[in-house]
Swiss-Prot record:
It comes from the Eukaryota. The lineage of its organism: Eukaryota, Metazoa, Chordata, Craniata, Vertebrata. Residues 654-699 are cytoplasmic. Belongs to the beta type-B retroviral envelope protein family. HERV class-II K(HML-2) env subfamily. One of its GO terms (molecular function) is structural molecule activity. Insertional polymorphism. Provirus present in 29% of tested individuals. This is Endogenous retrovirus group K member 113 Env polyprotein. Retroviral envelope proteins mediate receptor recognition and membrane fusion during early infection. Endogenous envelope proteins may have kept, lost or modified their original function during evolution. This endogenous envelope protein has lost its original fusogenic properties. Residues 10-20 have a biased composition (Basic residues). The chain crosses the membrane at residues 633-653. Specific enzymatic cleavages in vivo yield the mature SU and TM proteins. The record marks R465, F466 as: Cleavage. Glycans are attached at N100, N128, N153, N274, N355, N372, N461, N507, N554, N566, N585.
Amino acid sequence: MNPSEMQRKAPPRRRRHRNRAPLTHKMNKMVTSEEQMKLPSTKKAEPPTWAQLKKLTQLATKYLENTKVTQTPESMLLAALMIVSMVVSLPMPAGAAAANYTYWAYVPFPPLIRAVTWMDNPIEVYVNDSVWVPGPTDDHCPAKPEEEGMMINISIGYRYPPICLGRAPGCLMPAVQNWLVEVPTVSPISRFTYHMVSGMSLRPRVNYLQDFSYQRSFKFRPKGKPCPKEIPKESKNTEVLVWEECVANSAVILQNNEFGTIIDWAPRGQFYHNCSGQTQSCPSAQVSPAVDSDLTESLDKHKHKKLQSFYPWEWGEKGISTPRPKIISPVSGPEHPELWRLTVASHHIRIWSGNQTLETRDRKPFYTVDLNSSLTVPLQSCIKPPYMLVVGNIVIKPDSQTITCENCRLLTCIDSTFNWQHRILLVRAREGVWIPVSMDRPWEASPSIHTLTEVLKGVLNRSKRFIFTLIAVIMGLIAVTATAAVAGVALHSSVQSVNFVNDWQKNSTRLWNSQSSIDQKLANQINDLRQTVIWMGDRLMSLEHRFQLQCDWNTSDFSITPQIYNESEHHWDMVRRHLQGREDNLTLDISKLKEQIFEASKAHLNLVPGTEAIAGVADGLANLNPVTWVKTIGSTTIINLILILVCLFCLLLVCRCTQQLRRDSDHRERAMMTMAVLSKRKGGNVGKSKRDQIVTVSV
């Protein structure tokens, strides 16, 4: 094949470009998602610059390095898409969209948590065994086992010291505590028979017998029944431990550092030497299993305890009462007995039985306390929403008032498998937050105002159709009112089912009256009801806020208030601290902001929604009344009389002019008729005399 033939068979380049152009054009128009509706507020996006793409690549690379994910093209693309979606979902800073309207909004129950502090009220903690541990019981926890142990990273702030349990600064340390009941015996060699319970509790930092200002001070002593001076006797049922709250003679200190001072007035029973009546030196040192370094070992391996001395053994700090810690510095808060129910469930409790015997050695009385254990009871403690437990390496920073925890777990229950190498932080859902939100229209209280405003924008420019359009608007408002009335009827129909509720309540009343004891299933339902009441209390507080606020009509999940967001007064860093839960001098002043918002809402509540717009329409209609024009000139009798005379004169003048015009019109009509008659007779007057023609014209 010669070169000329090859050149003739080769396709021309220009034709190839022509075939490729339609394909490129179609590729430019191809989309991978549904076509989105273009709104009036939609703006054309600028193409990304090289600097933006470079920055996005750097952020994606940094994210993959932090998460230890291999950098592949697929992972880089996913990381970039995640960063873009996160940036798009972030709140728009003030000034980014000058055409938008920014107002303060109250968001109830956002997906945020805060730490439970020592100033909060005690929470409900449920145990699965009411025989050995007092308090509400529930053996059907957790409610959602598949969600237990979900991983979470937290970084939240606090105002008052948070409640934390574990071996870490700012947390209450665990320890083993004993509770003992006594049974007197008549045996000559046995003085007493003991039944003792050992379990996990809260460790005191200072020995309660040492002289300490907080211990001997009655300033923080709670009101309650004093602990008995005698050891509680055994109850009728030997398998039940009877708990009775009491106040000891002195307090123990659980924590005293930069995080605050926490004390407990519950009794801390342990054996000590009774040196009363002894002539020789008698050591009054205490002997307590709580000094063991390994907590689990003290409860698992030590199944036999023996105490021997030449001096009689006595049990100090009588009383079967649970710890009730409270904070007294830097602030004074309520007692929190629920913390012990969480701690005691972290390991099984051990049941002891034994006695104290008396024998003679070297011609001296010799006392021996012998305790043996062969029974352990596993426990489980749970909390319910809106409360949760964050378990992990919790770090509390008092300088910045922040709490951080990486790779922590969210739990609602604690059992004997818990490892005290971790810490427990009590958290709860946030009741509500204040954030600025942007809108593409001004704030409006009701849809009627919105409808009326949109219609009046066109009405004011077309005054000829004003009355008809106003009637249409009023008919639209009536339709809205009718819809609300129909909804009220439907609600009334639902309320009529209260008869069924009454019948059900009567049946349940008979059930409660006829039932002698409550089984565990009903007890669980009661606990759920109690927790629901607590949750509903938070909901009612949120509803109270929303009732006090005048909100925009087009939002239902949260409330957009009429208070305009001022960036110079509340910059975004203050809002960010508020979202984190930090409350310091730089944080958003919520109380002051609430006062401003409530004042703005009160100003809008002075008028019924739509009254201002309807009043403007009424004023416009009133201006069309000519009577108002007369009233504006004057209201005296003389002026009114002059005006009446002027009106009569004008009326008379109009009548005279009308009569004159009518006469002129008659003359014109007669002349026209005469001219018409003459034109018809123009050819028929030739044979007549001149006299007859004159007569005809005169006629």
